[in-house]
Swiss-Prot record:
Entry GO MF terms: alcohol dehydrogenase (NAD+) activity
Protein name as it appears in the record: Alcohol dehydrogenase
Catalytic activity: a primary alcohol + NAD(+) = an aldehyde + NADH + H(+); a secondary alcohol + NAD(+) = a ketone + NADH + H(+)
Pfam families the record matches: adh_short (PF00106)
Self-association and partners: Homodimer.
Single GO cellular component term: cytoplasm
Active site positions: Y151
Amino acid sequence: MVIANSNIIFVAGLGGIGLDTSREIVKSGPKNLVLLDRIDNPAAIAELKALNPKVTITFYPYDVTVPVDETKKLLKTIFDKLKTVDLLINGAGILDDHQIERTIAVNFAGTVNTTTAILDFWDKRKGGPGGVVANICSVTGFNSIYQVPVYSASKAAALSFTMSIAKLAHITGVTAYSINPGITKTILVHKFNSWLNVEPRVAELLLEHPTQTTLQCAQNFVKAIEANQNGAIWKLDLGRLDAIEWTKHWDSGI
């Protein structure tokens, strides 16, 4: 996918990996970058606008846990304004296994809801033009960090959902791929709660191992966007971008 002159919606593009990815996207010159985030960050938005004044950057407050119908209303506002949207990035996520319901609501259900809502505008069965979904999942969807089983399971669920959306592309016209960062130096991983406090030092222990910066992750994220491979499972770890070959142990046969 060519980012230049495209219209992109980025959910949670104002913090951590999201903000650095927004910076890299803006440098590539999209026509519009629409940022949907629960928390407003005027300083970051101003920085992005200054980075490339030719890009129109718009912010809408958005919580991914709202009902699908509310998301559809917001997307209608965006589509009415832009007419077309090329790429949806779902990047909302929390890492706190004390918040079980919210972890599932944000990391998994939020991804499902936003993707479901945009199908109203993209689905070729409804006369839509199709589109591309990039879902930020996690390497914990491959192998869990067992001290945070709720977070790991929510990301595995998001990964499975993304793989299914990709396989439905011939029906909907909507392609999808997953972005799976490894341990990245963000506020998210510097301090977080393990499930039932099974390992109070889990964040500290993770950071004793090699990590990557948010910039390294963002630069590889943009490479994945440009590659635009339906069904790709991208691992973004230690400054590398690698396509994962999924091992199939069962097939529905349909």
